[in-house]
Amino acid sequence: MQTLAQNLTSQGVDASLTQLIHTLANTSKEISHAVRHGALAGVLGATEQENVQGETQKKLDVITNDMLKDALKADNTVRGLASEEEDYIVEVGDKGEYLVCFDPLDGSSNIDINSLVGTIFSVLPAPTGELTESSFLQAGRKQVAAGYVLYGPSTMLALTTGKGVQLFTLNPETNEYLLTTEAMSISKDTGEFAINMSNQRFWEAPMQTYISDLLLGTIGPREKAFNMRWIAAMVGDVHRVLSRGGIFTYPTDNKNPQKPYKLRLMYEANPMSFLVEQAGGIASTGYEAIMDIEPSEIHQRVAVILGSANEVKACLEYHSLDYSEEPAL
């Protein structure tokens, strides 16, 4: 099996990006160690702080954020970073080539129940000149690398540099990432969907109708049985989609009219969309490709629909219909 280093060399990834990927991968090993120790290390539970999203921070949110921030600040390829747990961008150096956006511990609410969590990251080119928030506001198409690390029964790294998606598994004996899937590919068709059904009454009409039709199974217009899956961590749900197909969505809702979207564009939706598209899937808001969005701010949120190409297309057809007229009585 190829090591991560050998694989990056064989793909012709340049030296500076290779260095940055190793920084992220090596830090993920430290995070994996912290996650595994859990209650034994006293890192479970919440802090008394909230992040910029207004979410209560878990102890491991803060710990993993500091791990990544410290590692990236020591990497001379990095110009700046943005994190879910940081209110503002962090300037690292004036000569780095890359900007890094990350969610240090996606699904952290799962930590206290010993369920799946992960790290998501996006790498963008650093523009010249003064570093400001606008330096980060680049469409997802500009990403030069993206990936996630899943901390589960085994620790796995999914990575793309624009040449497909490679999956690596951390060997616990050698502490090396080894290539276990050379090219992840999402099946075009699926019988699985992932959505938080507790929000059903708050969704827009297109998603209400789409999910209702899936639930009707063989007696509905889709004439096919579907199973629902929900891990409550984007990293886990997207990993399942990459591994065996499916559609994952966190759609627009009016539960809180001031926050119609849940997932963050820069360090959740964009990197996951890059991976999904590189594996042959589609990633959309319902109305436009996620990676075509021109960001307006670093913590911007968006609706997300991604996964198996034919099923995402079917969902998008519902979003193209006119729901403005009341049905005739």
UniProtKB/Swiss-Prot annotation:
Q: Name one GO biological process term.
A: gluconeogenesis
Identify the residues that bind Mg(2+) 2: 103, 106, 268
Tell me which family the UniProt entry assigns to this protein.
Belongs to the FBPase class 1 family.
- Identify the GO cellular component terms for this protein: cytosol
Q: Which CDD domains match?
A: FBPase (cd00354)
The domain of life is Bacteria
The pathway noted for it is:
Carbohydrate biosynthesis; gluconeogenesis
Listed binding positions for Mg(2+) 1 are 84, 103, 105
Record-level Gene Ontology MF annotations:
fructose 1,6-bisphosphate 1-phosphatase activity; magnesium ion binding
Q: What is this protein called?
A: Fructose-1,6-bisphosphatase class 1
Q: Which cofactor does it need?
A: Mg(2+)
Q: Which reaction does it catalyse?
A: beta-D-fructose 1,6-bisphosphate + H2O = beta-D-fructose 6-phosphate + phosphate
Provide the E.C. number(s) assigned to this enzyme: 3.1.3.11
Q: How is the cofactor bound?
A: Binds 2 magnesium ions per subunit.
PANTHER family tied to this protein:
FRUCTOSE-1,6-BISPHOSPHATASE-RELATED, SEDOHEPTULOSE-1,7-BISPHOSPHATASE, CHLOROPLASTIC
Instruction: State where the protein is found.
Output: Cytoplasm
Looking up SUPFAM superfamilies in the UniProt record yields:
Carbohydrate phosphatase
| Sorted UniProt keywords | Carbohydrate metabolism, Cytoplasm, Hydrolase, Magnesium, Metal-binding
Q: Which InterPro entries match?
A: FBPase_C_dom, FBPase_class-1, FBPase_N, FBPtase
Coiled-coil annotated spans: none
User: Which proteins does it associate with, and in what oligomeric form?
Assistant: Homotetramer.
Chain sites annotated for binding substrate: 106-109, 196, 262
Identify the taxonomic lineage of the organism of origin: Bacteria, Pseudomonadati, Pseudomonadota, Gammaproteobacteria, Alteromonadales
